Amino acid sequence: MSVGRRRIKLLGILMMANVFIYFIMEVSKSSSQEKNGKGEVIIPKEKFWKISTPPEAYWNREQEKLNRQYNPILSMLTNQTGEAGRLSNISHLNYCEPDLRVTSVVTGFNNLPDRFKDFLLYLRCRNYSLLIDQPDKCAKKPFLLLAIKSLTPHFARRQAIRESWGQESNAGNQTVVRVFLLGQTPPEDNHPDLSDMLKFESEKHQDILMWNYRDTFFNLSLKEVLFLRWVSTSCPDTEFVFKGDDDVFVNTHHILNYLNSLSKTKAKDLFIGDVIHNAGPHRDKKLKYYIPEVVYSGLYPPYAGGGGFLYSGHLALRLYHITDQVHLYPIDDVYTGMCLQKLGLVPEKHKGFRTFDIEEKNKNNICSYVDLMLVHSRKPQEMIDIWSQLQSAHLKC
């Protein structure tokens, strides 16, 4: 077939295709007009995207404002409604003067317990410096960083951890390092002055990180942010992080075996622990985890119990960067769950984490600990005893 005939045939096919498309569009248009009755374009009565009604609870309301700052569409809508000016003076992180605005915008502020007043007044402050640092802790790229939340008076707990599951090691090019995370314990919180003892402990063991903020239960989420900042600057190459309390027993060997079994894909955004779903704030004022309705409303995202959890160093860096987009919350494990949710991640439940302990009948059976990663809670001497038994060459389970 000549080139000319091929071109004529191709043009014929294209013309037929155009006629077919035109026919389909006309049929579709006719059908739409019949359904509309008048053949007019239907215009929605309301805006497709509009700013939702602000929540009544203070934390939710402030978080909504923060969401608008970091969402380009919501930010644009905020500018259009003239609300940007009202947000500009209250949106800064690291603002460490008391935010007296909360005294008038939080319903019943004066009737709240003092711990809530302090938390709300200084909600935006994260600008705390290190008083004790370990800048060379991660000089050798750690495989596992053990980060343990502690308080200054807990000398016995820290020493028990050093002698048991928190031992630093460098076996098979897999370095395990340890840091304890502390804030200040001032006399007004009924703590004795233990600064000299802590200084001696830090100089001897080189494993204390201490910031100049008030170390209280409600400031544990602040401790989380400050620790993640330290990781990002002083330990960015650690492959994995275990973060837990100083009253837990951890089977470090089992954790290392588990981590070595992971694929690169699984390890990248690893976050495992004793995960809690569909939980919400407690409203009983007598409970440790009480949160008033005026502070927070709604359910919590999935979160791992704060006794301890395990995650990748890669995710630690991602978590730090996302903390700017999530206001501090009085409960640190919930706060971490909020940050994970912001990243579009869900923590994974692992049966080896027992933050609510094991059955009473199994507590004295050493074989019950072989396949566990964490048990909460254990006293210092119990940590040492369990660890010693697990290391026995005569152990048979």
From Swiss-Prot:
Catalysed transformations (reactions): a beta-D-galactosyl-(1->4)-N-acetyl-beta-D-glucosaminyl derivative + UDP-N-acetyl-alpha-D-glucosamine = an N-acetyl-beta-D-glucosaminyl-(1->3)-beta-D-galactosyl-(1->4)-N-acetyl-beta-D-glucosaminyl derivative + UDP + H(+)
GO annotations of cellular component type: Golgi membrane
Tagged with keyword Glycoprotein: yes
Residue ranges, Lumenal side: 29-397
Recorded topology in the membrane: Single-pass type II membrane protein
Transmembrane segments: 8-28
Functional summary from the UniProt entry: Beta-1,3-N-acetylglucosaminyltransferase involved in the synthesis of poly-N-acetyllactosamine. Catalyzes the initiation and elongation of poly-N-acetyllactosamine chains. Shows a marked preference for Gal(beta1-4)Glc(NAc)-based acceptors. Probably constitutes the main polylactosamine synthase.
PANTHER family, sorted: BETA-1,3-N-ACETYLGLUCOSAMINYLTRANSFERASE, N-ACETYLLACTOSAMINIDE BETA-1,3-N-ACETYLGLUCOSAMINYLTRANSFERASE 2
Family named by the database record: Belongs to the glycosyltransferase 31 family.
Protein name: N-acetyllactosaminide beta-1,3-N-acetylglucosaminyltransferase 2
Protein's organism: Homo sapiens
Gene that this sequence comes from: B3GNT2
